[in-house]
């Protein structure tokens, strides 16, 4: 089965040894993704929108898009940001309504990140 890996050019991908996304057959797995500068200065909503844009770009490289997402896992530093995070998630995924989990964590990388998202997508050719 064909395996395709995608890099987003984020230096930590090489440092840590991972791909932004991997497609195997009809399945696409996108690694945990945070906002990047200059969006790290924004609030949780702005950071989530920026992270989802990076996810969307990775999906497009393997012939998918946000409509193909079937599961999201969102990691948040502060659950007080849930309304902002949910707004960004709803605006981005309302049409496909993926299964979703929200997890509070102590810290993310980079340290100024407030939220991170990882997704699984299924592409029906």
Regions found by a protein language model. Give the residues of each.
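Short, polar/acidic, helix-capping and beta-turn segments at strand->helix junctions
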Residues: 1-125
